[in-house]
Amino acid sequence: MFNRSEKVAEAIHELVSGLIVKGMKDPRIGFITITGVKVTDDIRQATIYYTVMGDDEARVSTARGLASATGFLRREIGKQLRLKFAPELHFKYDQSIEYGNRIDQLLKEIETEKGSDD
């Protein structure tokens, strides 16, 4: 069963994803994917996890763009979700994709080494 904070997190995920694609014109924000949102039980804070295609420069640039868009996004969340208090937004780069890719790469290397030993 979903509690209120999980429902709000899901709504924020959909809304922020849409706003970034359609509503933001900041050139610093590159090809970004929102991977998850966690909201505190009191709905006062939301952590938005994201990934960015590109190098470290693209990641830094996107982080700056998101930081400057926080007020706009928070205002839109409050308006569109009709919350008494719009949560304070925190953006955090999601390293799980990179971590998974690294594990996959290591497993392939092990498999290649086993194949050459036979």
Curated annotation (Swiss-Prot):
Cellular component terms (Gene Ontology): cytosol
Annotated compartments: Cytoplasm
Any matching Pfam family: RBFA
Superkingdom: Bacteria
One MF term in the entry's GO annotations: ribosomal small subunit binding
One biological process term in Gene Ontology: maturation of SSU-rRNA
Protein keywords: Cytoplasm, Ribosome biogenesis
Entries under InterPro entries matching the protein: KH_dom-like_a/b (IPR015946), RbfA (IPR000238), RbfA_dom_sf (IPR023799), Ribosome-bd_factorA_CS (IPR020053)
Gene3D superfamilies for the chain: 3.30.300.20
Family the entry assigns: Belongs to the RbfA family.
Subunit structure, as described in the record: Monomer. Binds 30S ribosomal subunits, but not 50S ribosomal subunits or 70S ribosomes.
Physiological role: One of several proteins that assist in the late maturation steps of the functional core of the 30S ribosomal subunit. Associates with free 30S ribosomal subunits (but not with 30S subunits that are part of 70S ribosomes or polysomes). Required for efficient processing of 16S rRNA. May interact with the 5'-terminal helix region of 16S rRNA.
Cross-referenced PANTHER family: RIBOSOME-BINDING FACTOR A, CHLOROPLASTIC-RELATED (PTHR33515:SF1)
Protein name (record): Ribosome-binding factor A
